[in-house]
Structure formats: C-alpha cells, structure tokens
C-alpha cells in the first residue's frame, strides 16, 4: 500500500489487488456499507503512518475508485467530532451477491463526483493530435496525416438501453482487450467509448471488432465530445476491464 497527501484535508491511499487479497477483501466489498469494510479501513489506518493532522481528526469520509490493477481510496477529514462515516461508500442495503443494479448504483454514488481526475490519456492524445492537424496543416497534408493517425487508432461510441445490456456486453467480451474505455450515463441511456490500437493488426480488424461490439451494444447517437460535456461520467478510464473483472451474481 502507498499513501500520498493531496491536500490538508485529503489523502490518497493506493491499495494493490495483492493487498486486498492479503486482507481477505474483494472489489465488491467496497460497494456496500458493512462491518467488514469498516474493519478494513481501521486496519489500513493502523498500518499506515497517517499525517498528524489526520490523527484524531474527527469524522473521516472515504471514497473508493477501482483501477485496473489497484483500488484508490480517497480519505477526507472534516472538523466534525464524529466517528468514521462510511456512508460515502454507498447508501445501498445489504445484499447477498453483487447484482448489476447495485454495482451501477455504487458507481453513480461514488464515482461521478470523484476528485482524482486523470485524463484518459490515449483518447485525449488522439483528439489533441487531430486538432493540431486541423489548425496547422494544409488540406492535402491534413488528409494524409489524419489517415495515418486513424491507421494507428480508432474509437467507437456504443449505446446501451439498460445496465443489464452493459453487463452482457462485458461478459461477452471477456477475452477482448482495448486500449482505452470510458463509461457514461445520459438520461436513461448508458454509453461506452472504446479505443482500439490498430497498428499491429490486419486491415479487417477494426471492422471485425466493431461488428463484434454491435452483437451486444447499439450504435450510439451521441459523440464522445457531446458525452464529455453533457453526460455523467461513471468511469473515466479502464471501464471495460473493470466491468469484465467484476463477478456478477
């Protein structure tokens, strides 16, 4: 485990999957308010050398963000003299087994306002490069450059009518790896952006993968820039791997 102080009131604790396993924890344990989760946080706090201003500081709130190979826990202190508040993790009732609905509820509660904003590097670099091409190149040169960029990367926006369809999509693509993925909600519709790296693949790879995606998803009627501006982002990176790795009941 590693700890980094972000500000006077916020710590970031990075917990590897090996750390979780050693403590008998799973990713889904963070999605419900239960005694096991509370005990784990007390244990982590005992094991780490907390800054002095976090010791006996009153109420602490926790926000959990799953990553591809770890869990990031953001610890925020307040001046209220109360016990640890674990309600920030979720407001769901106890359940037996993780259902898609419960997982989605936890995502909406915990992730859409998270403060650890890390750019979705590959997609952002792709968009930035295309923008620079637009602004600096003549039309013939621009066409050649854009074609070269698209040969290396392509991205798709997929739509899902409900969260069950998202789960089916992730389960149906268990063995598929992508360069990047984001997960959004807009109204009652869910969206996922998928970035594919094409440089080492045959010419037909992109079309084959898109056809495979559409076996489980729908063609989106929104672009990624539109979703970035208007939709709620539930996972801003590694959305597909996280959903693939989750065990559904």
Curated annotation (Swiss-Prot):
A GO term for molecular function: protein-macromolecule adaptor activity
InterPro entries hit by this protein: MecA_C_sf, Neg-reg_MecA
Domain of life where this protein originates: Bacteria
Pfam families given in the database record: MecA
Domain comment in the entry: The N-terminal domain probably binds unfolded/aggregated proteins; the C-terminal domain interacts with ClpC.
Function text: Enables the recognition and targeting of unfolded and aggregated proteins to the ClpC protease or to other proteins involved in proteolysis.
Entry similarity comment: Belongs to the MecA family.
Assembly and oligomerization: Homodimer.
Name of this protein: Adapter protein MecA
Protein's gene: mecA
